[in-house]
Amino acid sequence: MHRFRTLVVTTAVILSLATMAVMSIASATPNNQPDITTAQTFTVLAHATNFKMINVDGEDIGPGDYLVERWALRRSGSPAGRLNDQCTINFNQTPSNPTALCLFAFTFSGKGEITAESSVVFAPAPEGFRPVPFDLPVTGGTGSYQNARGQIHVQFRDLADASFTFHLIP
């Protein structure tokens, strides 16, 4: 009888632990369903709010130096989220056109995140250098954008303002 009770209690404990494990895994699964079921195009405007340049060797800007930025995003005139990016200066194509390898994380309030990365070429501008228009390949997403693919066209309007046109496909 003692052996039977031990077996029943052990079985109940194992079943309880297995049930909790399954429920934990199920609750960790994202609730957001992908929104990208057909091709989508939309534009957000960005305004730079934070900027920091890190010069790793204390000399002129060159390979290995990097910058980090934060941008406020607006869509149809309303706040839409933020963009964080980091660019590392690479070897120049020409002395007047520095290049950088850049990572971008667009966080859209209540929707998810879209990530992208690319090489960016800069051209002389009145304020120093400004990126020439370029396209970013989308590398991933979360939440509503978890299945996003495509590209983002980037056009700088001035030093602190840019437009990002997303061309997303499922």
Task: Go through each PLM region and give its residues.
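Targeting-peptide/extracellular-domain and disordered-appendage signature
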Residues: 2-9, 17-170
